[in-house]
A protein has these predicted regions:
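Periplasmic c-type cytochrome electron-transfer domains
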Residues: 1-251
């Protein structure tokens, strides 16, 4: 409902709509596998960790961790075990429990022992990794701009029919006077960074703190690159390691 294949896997709405209404626009998924940080504020540092966020969010999918684990065990056990090994024992665990649910779900989660919570979280993390594997397959098709640039890089005259005259004027403005390319550069037309562009908040009484609030979230995320459920080696987590450094020289 939020990720329409005809719209680069987003919905085209100002804010996302799930079981409730969100505060930001649904992100397009095509090409997301190349992103360093995920969500508009970068509160996730991998595609698989990002895939988990909406599942437990109260206004998106509104689910909880044990419910997803039970669903996988009931409906996709064979596929799960082919990819990730034996499914842990879930018999006797509450159907609805999780660290981010309502009071009843949180209480049920707290009543589970550490091993049970870790087992469920491992299944949940693997669910995100399976979703991310599919999402990484969604790639942009070569565009007319790609063909234009490839010709110039190869030293060939660009086909005059590839870009219209008004598009060529826009491209010159984008690269030149507009200086859009300062931030929008590279194959994906992004520098993968965060910028304060001076746009006023949608709601002045409740400003969106954006990246300022997200840094603490990604550092404390149990599913981050350095966490126990990550398959990444420490040297593959340079951005997060830099962010978490307490060296004054890096502040």
């Amino acid at each position: 409902s939020c990720h329409d294949p005809q719209r680069q896997f987003q919905d085209g709405l100002p804010v996302g709509r799930g079981v409730g209404t969100g505060t930001r626009r649904s992100m397009p998924i095509v090409g997301a596998g190349y992103s360093t940080w995920l969500f508009w504020d970068g509160r996730k540092d991998s595609l698989w960790a990002q895939a988990l966020g909406p599942l437990e969010d109260a206004v998106e999918h509104g689910g909880n961790r044990t419910r997803y684990a039970h669903l996988l065990a009931s409906n996709h056990r064979k596929e799960y075990e082919t990819l990730f090994g034996a499914m842990p024992r879930l018999e006797g665990l509450p159907r609805d429990a999780g660290p981010h649910g309502d009071a009843v779900e949180k209480a049920a989660w707290a009543a589970m022992d550490t091993r049970q919570r870790d087992d469920v979280s491992r299944v949940f993390a693997n669910m995100g990794k399976a979703i991310a594997a599919y999402e990484k397959s969604l790639q942009h098709e070569p565009s007319r701009l790609d063909r234009h640039v490839e010709a110039l890089v190869a030293g060939r005259a660009a086909d005059p029919g590839v870009l219209r005259p008004d598009e060529l004027r826009g491209l010159r403005l984008f690269i030149g006077k507009g200086q859009c390319v300062t931030c929008h550069n590279g194959p994906l037309l992004t520098d993968q960074q965060f910028h304060n562009t001076g746009v006023p908040p949608r709601d002045a009484a409740r400003p969106d703190r954006g990246r300022a609030a997200a840094t603490a979230k990604v550092r404390g995320d149990e599913f981050n690159c350095l966490g126990p459920f990550s398959d990444a080696r420490p040297e593959q987590c340079q951005e997060l390691r830099f962010m978490m450094s307490d060296d004054p020289a890096l502040e």
